[in-house]
């Protein structure tokens, strides 16, 4: 059995609704649901969730660990939430959150407007910092990657949009 799949999930402040095809987790920040895999049996046992492969195949064994990780992320998302911090490095690079849109000035001849998907919010504590928050880990990471993709850090001066903990290794310029 998968090592990840063996460990149970503690449902601290979250409620889980299990059906044959969906797993729905509700918490103080909202609710999120996921398709259940037919190869994995999910058991709710007094505030803990346990995942077991439905048969002895390698695929069922692997999917038990995958489902456990996905549901653990759902529980974490509805109780504490996920956030990703981005930093803008460069002269004139600015960000401003307006409702469900993120306005970016990244040195192009036009401003870049990024539409936030449902369930994801952007905050700008300062003009060069962006905090992306939400309950779905995949959506938060995807939005952060899309925003970073508008102007990734370039290797000579390091200008661009980068994750807050990202280390950009700078190249040396050519010498004559």
Curated annotation (Swiss-Prot):
Keywords from the named record: Ribonucleoprotein, Ribosomal protein, RNA-binding, rRNA-binding
SUPFAM superfamilies named in the record: Ribosomal protein L6
UniProt GO molecular function: rRNA binding; structural constituent of ribosome
GO cellular component, one term: cytosolic large ribosomal subunit
Biological process annotations from GO: cytoplasmic translation
Described function: This protein binds to the 23S rRNA, and is important in its secondary structure. It is located near the subunit interface in the base of the L7/L12 stalk, and near the tRNA binding site of the peptidyltransferase center.
Subunit structure: Part of the 50S ribosomal subunit.
NCBIfam families tied to this protein: L6_bact (TIGR03654)
Family of this protein: Belongs to the universal ribosomal protein uL6 family.
Protein name as annotated: Large ribosomal subunit protein uL6
Designated gene of the protein: rplF
